[in-house]
């Protein structure tokens, strides 16, 4: 499914994204390596075993990136002018290797662009849940989207 144009969104629209993903150890190691994050809590099984979690936590950059990435097909694919910002990013529960994550997006604000008559600004609340239905990540995202061509 392609993303929606600005004028195809209504405040309150909610999308449950069809893509879910089971997190692997390779995912966690790659994102930690790519972002130069040597935090033992993510990559050192022995060190992580001594924490309250008892095992490595998945790097939150992966969790956030996956949540936003799986939303693109249903929200902004082919209609995005620019991402304007992310806000209120939280990680209420940890993610572990083997967790399966699913995400949803809800349109929470719309406004016309003052400087671009062919575009508008959309704000979504993005949420990601593990296989137990526990909220593991959430944020708001604001983007400038094209209006539907005439």
Model-identified regions with their sequence ranges:
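Hot-dog-fold acyl-thioester-processing enzymes
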Residues: 1-85, 149-150
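HotDog/MaoC-like acyl-thioester-processing domains
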Residues: 1-11, 91, 95-100, 104-150
């Amino acid at each position: 499914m392609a993303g929606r144009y600005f004028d195809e969104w209504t405040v309150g629209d909610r999308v449950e994204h069809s893509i879910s993903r089971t997190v692997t150890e390779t995912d966690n190691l790659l994102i930690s390596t790519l972002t130069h994050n040597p935090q033992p809590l993510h990559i050192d099984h022995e060190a992580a075993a001594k924490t309250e979690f008892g095992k490595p936590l998945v790097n939150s950059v992966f969790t956030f990136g996956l949540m936003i990435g799986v939303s693109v097909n249903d929200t902004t694919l082919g209609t995005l002018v620019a991402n304007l910002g992310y806000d209120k990013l939280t990680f209420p529960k940890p993610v572990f290797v083997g967790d399966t994550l699913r995400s949803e997006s809800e349109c929470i604000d719309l406004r016309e662009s003052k400087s671009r008559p062919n575009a508008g600004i959309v704000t979504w609340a993005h949420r990601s849940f593990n296989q137990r239905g526990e909220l593991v990540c959430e944020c708001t995202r604001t983007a400038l989207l094209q209006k539907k061509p005439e």
